Amino acid sequence: MVSSNFYKNLGPRKLTAIIDFLHDIIEPPKIHEDIAIHDIKILQEASPNDISFLSNPKYSEFLKTTKAAACIVPKNFTGEANPNTVLLHTQNSYFAYGKLIDFFYAPIKSYPAKIMKSAIVADSATIGKNCYIGHNVVIEDDVIIGDNSIIEAGSFIGRGVNIGRNARIEQHVSINYTIIGDDVVILAGAKIGQDGFGFSTEKGIHHKIFHIGIVKIGNNVEIGANTTIDRGSLQDTIIKDLCRIDNLVQIGHGVKIGKGSIIIAQTGIAGSSTIGKYCTLGGQVGIAGHLNIGDGAQVAAQGGVAQNIEAGKIVGGSPAVPIMDWHRQSIIMKQLLTSNSKLKK
């Protein structure tokens, strides 16, 4: 159940209004009685006043018994459902669900256009219109922050950093040596623009290499909580538009990540590697340094990548191999273990 402590329910909404809002309902059903929908709930918990959704077929059995007044389903869904539940077929039911959340809910917490008294803002910093600068934020010299941006409590914005419009920087984020585009979200605890892990070894001593690159983050990027992005040693670290980076990701110095790529939690990318456009790296993936991952490539969770990956390829395992080879290896290993167990008996 959604907590009213944190989110405001904007309902009820008429079912016809929901259909109009979603736009992409395929052959909208005729509504004989315009039902008032009060909330969004999962199939198992929905009441006759709620709407639900189905995006994963493993939950389709619950459509038979759900009490939901209506349910968003994929366009090709032909399974059984409660006859009292109105089915709304959409091109992308999960995307429609996300839109419905915005239609039904808003956060209670608001951010007035204000600089809190405890914030420290340098005289040479430029703060745009309608910005919120939270408690104990530090903004150093020559920083530029675009209009309608939010910098939450305890964050540090280092000298010369440029943040675009409509940014949301959550609590205790530190940003140095970085240029950020518009509509960027950075979740709590992220660290961006610090030195990378660069040392030269001479006579048994590891000497720090001064990093003179920066971090460049494009438009409409989200960076997860406690993720770290190092600035480049000589070439810049670059995150292109539309990327989604999960929590606890490590991005090394000089890494370049192409437009629209998705990187899942606990992934580490070593320095100077390039990730192409619209790539997907599963959880706990490791990418060695100085590699090239082609556009649209995918790496399954816990994959260890030590060689370049061609565009569009799907790999898994450690060391990573083509995904079907990895599946075969897993089956053979299981068969060997079973055979060995039988021999011992």
UniProtKB/Swiss-Prot annotation:
CDD domains reported for this sequence: LbH_LpxD
Entries under SUPFAM superfamilies matching the protein: Trimeric LpxA-like enzymes (SSF51161)
Recorded GO CC terms: membrane
Highest taxon of source: Bacteria
EC numbers on record: 2.3.1.191
One Pfam assignment: Hexapep
Metabolic or biological pathway, per its Swiss-Prot or TrEMBL entry: Bacterial outer membrane biogenesis; LPS lipid A biosynthesis
GO terms, biological process: lipid A biosynthetic process
Catalysed reactions, semicolon-separated: a UDP-3-O-[(3R)-3-hydroxyacyl]-alpha-D-glucosamine + a (3R)-hydroxyacyl-[ACP] = a UDP-2-N,3-O-bis[(3R)-3-hydroxyacyl]-alpha-D-glucosamine + holo-[ACP] + H(+)
Family annotation (PROSITE patterns): HEXAPEP_TRANSFERASES
Xref: InterPro entries: Hexapep, Hexapep_transf_CS, LpxD, Trimer_LpxA-like_sf, UDP_GlcNAc_AcTrfase_non-rep
Active site location: 253 (proton acceptor)
GO molecular function: N-acyltransferase activity
Keywords: Acyltransferase, Lipid A biosynthesis, Lipid biosynthesis, Lipid metabolism, Repeat, Transferase
PANTHER family: UDP-3-O-ACYLGLUCOSAMINE N-ACYLTRANSFERASE, UDP-3-O-ACYLGLUCOSAMINE N-ACYLTRANSFERASE 1, MITOCHONDRIAL-RELATED
Quaternary organization: Homotrimer.
Family of the protein in this entry: Belongs to the transferase hexapeptide repeat family. LpxD subfamily.
Function: Catalyzes the N-acylation of UDP-3-O-acylglucosamine using 3-hydroxyacyl-ACP as the acyl donor. Is involved in the biosynthesis of lipid A, a phosphorylated glycolipid that anchors the lipopolysaccharide to the outer membrane of the cell.
Name by which UniProt lists this protein: UDP-3-O-acylglucosamine N-acyltransferase
Annotated source species: Rickettsia massiliae (strain Mtu5)
